[in-house]
């Protein structure tokens, strides 16, 4: 029974899943939007939104927790200085998932684009 087991396994080991979502979260924070499968986008939202909430607190402990999750000092600085200030007055819902019309060519997987809802983020500052 799968009672209280949240999250998709995506046919990967736990370490592979952790690395996949760490890389996807880093790319989303770096570029502002990425295209991926619909299932991965929905799971990525569960990782990125708490990171932005953490960045809104803007203290040393929050930075250390964000680095623990992201693993890159430059991206942590970008998250805290550029991404989070755009969401100061937003109570939640920092990302938007848009389903794309075309499916992936190889396996016909449903694709989606995940992006930040606020577009005032400067991508060039990394």
UniProtKB/Swiss-Prot annotation:
Top-level division of the source organism's lineage: Bacteria
GO BP of this protein: translation
Pfam families named among the record's database cross-references: Ribosomal_L17
GO annotation, cellular component aspect: cytosolic large ribosomal subunit
MF terms (GO), sorted A to Z: structural constituent of ribosome
Record SUPFAM superfamilies: Prokaryotic ribosomal protein L17 (SSF64263)
Protein's name in the database: Large ribosomal subunit protein bL17
Source species: Lawsonia intracellularis (strain PHE/MN1-00)
């Amino acid at each position: 029974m799968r009672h209280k087991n949240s999250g998709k396994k995506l046919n990967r080991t736990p370490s592979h899943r952790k690395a996949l979502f760490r890389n996807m979260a880093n790319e989303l924070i770096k570029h502002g939007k990425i295209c991926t499968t619909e299932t991965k986008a929905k799971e990525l939202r569960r990782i990125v939104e708490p990171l932005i909430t953490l960045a809104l607190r803007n203290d040393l402990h929050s930075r250390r927790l964000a680095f623990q999750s992201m693993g890159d000092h430059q991206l942590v600085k970008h998250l805290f200085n550029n991404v989070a200030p755009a969401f100061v007055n937003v109570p939640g819902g920092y990302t938007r998932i848009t389903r794309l019309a075309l499916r992936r060519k190889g396996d016909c997987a449903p694709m989606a684009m995940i992006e930040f809802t606020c577009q005032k983020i400067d991508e060039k500052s990394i």
